[in-house]
């Protein structure tokens, strides 16, 4: 009986390993439609998040091809495009951003990995500053607790960057709409409010602040609420 149980556990473990390997080497396109009378005209957005320096094909050729087929009006990046480990670098993320910036407007808000490399300079040196400088030079717009107004669409696009303590796994912090307002100010009246916020745990607070549509990431496999 014990041998059967061990064999079952082994088969189950191998199954999940195979699934993980397959999942880490593919991407899925999911489409969502949002309508609001405040929007002046249709807008197609592609969101990228949590690639952690992953390449799908040489220099992300498969991913870039899929994005071009979508023909977006702009691209939103919601953080963690590289991994904050000392032996890691940002080349794959840089090359992808460079290629996309040639054809599209790109708006980028940091994830916790970008924040870590920016704040812990003793460990990472100028990695973040070099990365951001290169991307800004490509025309990519970084939004760190600031916003831009997209006049053609009547959209106010905000990039929220919260303190890293809000990413703690076992001691969840309370954020609150008031704290979001301290970061971003009062939302612009009359426009449609889009927010790039890497951490999805605080959707209720983002909505209470005034966000109409939030682009998040961080949890990779999705968020489950019981």
Predicted regions and their residues:
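Conserved catalytic scaffold of divalent metal-dependent phosphoesterases
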Residues: 38, 53, 114-213, 219
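Membrane-embedded segments
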Residues: 41-141
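Short, solvent-exposed loop/turn segments at secondary-structure junctions
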Residues: 85, 203-204, 223
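N-terminal membrane-anchoring alpha-helices
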Residues: 1-39
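Alpha-helical membrane-targeting segments
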Residues: 58, 223-226
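Hydrophobic residues on conserved beta-strands that form the core of alpha/beta folds
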Residues: 29-31, 45-48, 144, 157
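Short beta-strand-to-loop junctions in surface cap/lid or active-site-entrance loops
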Residues: 34-39, 66-68, 158
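Non-cysteine beta-strand/loop elements that form the S-adenosyl-L-methionine
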Residues: 107, 216-221
């Amino acid at each position: 009986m014990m041998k059967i149980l061990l064999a079952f556990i082994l088969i189950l473990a191998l199954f999940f390993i195979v699934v993980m390997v397959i999942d880490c080497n593919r991407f899925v396109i999911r489409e969502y439609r949002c309508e609001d009378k405040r929007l002046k005209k249709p807008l197609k957005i592609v969101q990228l998040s949590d690639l952690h320096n992953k390449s799908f094909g040489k220099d992300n050729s498969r991913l870039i091809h899929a994005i071009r087929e979508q023909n977006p009006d702009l691209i939103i990046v919601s953080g963690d495009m590289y991994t904050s480990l000392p032996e890691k670098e940002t080349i794959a993320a840089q090359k992808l951003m460079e290629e996309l910036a040639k054809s599209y407007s790109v708006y980028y808000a940091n994830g916790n990995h970008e924040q870590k490399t920016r704040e812990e300079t003793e460990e990472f040196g100028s990695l973040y500053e070099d990365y951001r400088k290169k991307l800004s030079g490509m025309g990519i717009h970084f939004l760190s607790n600031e916003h831009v107004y997209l006049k053609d669409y009547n959209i106010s696009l905000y990039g929220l960057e919260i303190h890293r303590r809000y990413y703690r796994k076992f001691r969840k912090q309370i954020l609150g709409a008031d704290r979001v307002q301290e970061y971003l100010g009062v939302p612009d009246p009359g426009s449609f409010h889009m927010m790039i916020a890497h951490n999805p745990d605080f959707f209720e607070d983002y909505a209470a602040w005034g966000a109409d549509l939030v682009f998040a990431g961080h949890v990779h496999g999705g968020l489950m609420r019981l």
